[in-house]
Amino acid sequence: MPKDVSPSHFAKEENSLSQALAIKHRVCIQNQPPTRCLSNCAPGTAVVQAKREKYSRKNNPAVILMEKVIAAKKASNLRQHDYYSVEKYDKLSFALSDITPKVFEEGTFKAMPFLKEHVETSPETGKLILPLSVDETVSQEIYRKKQNEKKSIVKGQRTTGMNELIDTGDILASMLQDVFTEVNIYEDDIRFVQSQFLSPIASNGAISFYRYFIEDTTYVDGNKCIQVSFGPNNSRDFGFTGSLYIMADSTFRIAKADISIPIKSTVNYVKRINIAQQFTQLPSGEQVLAKNDMFVLLEAAKFLKTLEVKRYTEYTNYSFSPLSDRLFRFRGNTKIEPDAMMQEDKFWAQHRTEQLTKSEDQTSLFVKRIMNIPGIKPFIWVGKSLIENYVPTSIDEEHPSKIDIGPVNTMITTNPVDGLRFRASAQTTANFNPHFFWRGYLAYGIRDHRWKGMGEMTYSFKKKAYLPMEFPTANLTFSYSYDVGVPSDQYLNTDKDNVFRALTWSSVKHMMYDRSFKLIFDREWEDGLQWKTQLRHSQTEPTYHLFYQPVSHAYQSEPGQPYSITPWGPGSGKNIANLNRNFLTITDLSMTLKYQPGVAYINTKQRRILVNKEAPIYRISHTVGLKGLASDYTYNLTEIGVRKRVWLHSWGRMDFDFAAGAQWNKVPFPLLIMPKANLSYVYEDDMYNLVNNMEFFNDRYAQLMFNWNLHGKIFNRIPLINRLKIREHIGVNVLWGRLTDKNNPDLEQNRNRDDIFVFPGEFQNGTFKPTGYAMNPRIPYVEASFGIHNIFKLVHVDYVRRFTYIDDPAITRWGIRFMVRVIF
């Protein structure tokens, strides 16, 4: 062993390699604090005393060795071949951990004596566990070099256990698969626990990010190997730790890897991760992954039970034979064979490379026994309602829910026009009809005494499992709605009358009733392409402090005086009813094209959750106003946009969202372009935090929204604060806007026009004070946010500051926004 490198320095400095326990190759750690044993311990194993030294990369044999390993990676790149295919078996299991015999004798489990038949001992922890769900997938991965195309064909898919209790059944498995993705160290960047980790053998950056130590020589499958331990420079950064077993020959191939994360890692809810990887050499010389055995121990809080997640993946039958073009003839990256979910036991016996345990094989029986417990169904019904935000009308497996009531968080809320607002909502499910769907709501405001509502009928050309929004869509929808709101409501990711949105930082005084009919065709393809066409007829009615007064009807300064315009209001002596327009009626046709390669969603009852946020999103839309077709105006609105996420390894991630657009015709202010104003204290992604309702009006705009989550890169280096595991967030929103002369009501050239309206404002003691303006094209709107995220692993708090357009005393220059979000 080289004398200039302390083999135990890394353990002393990190105290984290004790977590690098191979799943089937247990590592022994000696009781003496400053000592360790990294290899598989056996009688006579040497124990090395830790000695603290300064780490140096210069002339470091471990670093020199790793540079050779990294350089040799190219020889194992399967994409050098014209074709390749491989069979893949994947098993994902989820279990309740740390079960003790005592729990069966008291409390809730006392009424479930059958649970004793379903528990088993975890080989990783030695404790009793209760398997809750098992998901298995058999697939074939195929690749062709000419088109640089890699795809997956799913031949078998099987789900048992707790997933059967969730109506959108794939949500649990999809979330676990998205969080605990496959780890392949031969890839430079590894997406894991919804973040990006740098591989210890990444071509760029690994040598500077990790520290390496030569530990020992050992044998793996009869091959002499050099064991190298590794870990990040800062144990709180998002990085791996563990050991690599490198072939002691000129190929520098990796035979085995034991991977974990540091004890001090700021990854949330993860108490322990162990990943054991085995590699094999193909006859053609490439070193490829053969088995990936992952074990994760989750802990949400100290007072709660821990959970075990296991993911076992095995690759077999590597082949470089030519593949038929027919195999690649499907859109998207994944194709599920029609009979994949109907495979019989014979298929699984043939393709299952790791047998299920007795308890794993009985997870369906376990769920049935749970459901047969007297009095249990009301508790399950309440639990499902709280988790899914919808109340199912049945939880009987033989008669599943055909109608779900909800969302629950919209039943009671408030706004300035409605006052206290009550809403009843419901939607049908695929159990009613897998092609025809209905959803709607009825609401009533105590203050305005008006009934509002929405009804929507959808026909899905594709058979759905539960809801029509499941990806990919091919839906024809007709809807009618009558409700009150503000223009920014259309940009929200949640329902506009979500009870939490009632907490507004700005006094909302300009609202409108909107009665609209929509006919929508929405088509998505597996490769990420989306086409949406909408025909809309809408009639808006201003309410509260909002009014539609044509410029020609407003008071204007006398000839010879500087031009100014002021609307007539209460106390003016004018008949306001004759001056103001009661309604604005439009009919328009819009077309939207969006492309997001590699798109993937998790389905919930309320919305789809985008999981592959690394892929860019390109979008373009155009809307045409159809005057004469029950419409007051002709107009053309064009918008484009692109969104991209960039990972910076240990420095976190940056999100960029750019958009631009133009309203080409003469239109009143309700048809101009207004910023996406978030009026709530609850933080919303991709919205302006300090722009007031209807504050800016543009017919040309460009905007950039930037967010940088640093993953604790700075806080992790501050003593004491680093123990809190909080993370930094920086955001900047910039809006450039311009209003052309033809749409500016404040210009004298428009004084006689009745097709544009005076901008919104309010009357104070008979004096009109405008609250909406045209932006100065030389001065962009700029706001920034500085946040502390991951407080108690849930709460995000941001300080937001506005830097331009701050001369008006009524403007709010700064504020605090918050949100609750579960992240790893």
Residue ranges and their predicted role:
Residues M1-N59, R272-N274, N292-K305:
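Periplasmic N-terminal soluble interaction domains immediately after the signal peptide in Gram-negative
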Residues R52-C225, G231-G239, A301-G406, T410-T413, ...:
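Structured extracytoplasmic
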Residues Y83, D221-S229, R253-D258, E286-K291, ...:
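Short, hydrophobic/aromatic-rich segments at coil-to-beta transitions
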Residues K91-F94, N233, P262-K264, T280, ...:
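Hydrophobic lipid-interacting interfaces of membrane-associated proteins
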Residues Q196-L198, F320, F330-F824:
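Exposed, low-structure sequence patches enriched in small/polar residues
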Residues N204-F209, R236-G242, V267-A276, T306-Y312, ...:
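Amphipathic hydrophobic-ligand
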Residues E215, G242-A248, N274-S284:
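Extended lipid/amphipathic-ligand handling interfaces
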Residues I261-P262, V267-Y312:
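Short aromatic loop motif centered on NTY/YTY
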